[in-house]
Amino acid sequence: MQLAQTRNHSTLLGALFVALCSLQVPAETKSSTADTQSRAPAGEADGRHDFDWDIGTWKTHQRRLLHPLTGSSTWVEYHGTDVVRKIWDGANIGEIRADGTAGRLELMTLRLYNPQTHEWSVYFSNSTKGALSPPAVGGFHNGRGDFYDQETYDGKTILLRFSVSDITADSCRFEQAFSADGGKTWEANFIVTETLVRD
């Protein structure tokens, strides 16, 4: 998951998505180990079902850093829903609607799996953008997903990392981070915690 400030802003909003699972919302109830394992990424060579655990409706809590890579510590928060649907054989699309102190977010995530490279491409967009972002590309290892892209932000070449972690049967965490030093250090700027809505 940048060539203009508007595109950067859209990517920030897209992660976790959310981009997109945050720091503080634990699952309200613990599920059985079998249930947890059935929703966790498969971790097999054919990873087209790595995101199957994410299919469903989620409560989403999102935190966005207003001014990344400036030393700022001003965050805004949003609450809403993320509805993730399966498409084709393993791909999926998520629609996020959330409201917060900085207004309303209407976001979309598209995740496509390449069976030749065994990699995922994660795309983001929002209701005002009218286009998909360049993809963040990567995969899952040991229950964590990391996806990378090189972009331009405020005239500087940066690395973008979109991560998926803390995956349980009914909760997960997404994080977008930027690096301005080639990946030596990372600053998180979009953090999302999601909790599965049970029928």
PLM feature spans:
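Glycine-centered signal
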Residues: M1, L20, Q24-P26
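Bacterial N-terminal signal peptides that target proteins for export
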Residues: Q2-L13
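Hydrophobic small-molecule pocket/channel-lining residues, especially in calycin-type beta-barrels
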Residues: A27-D199
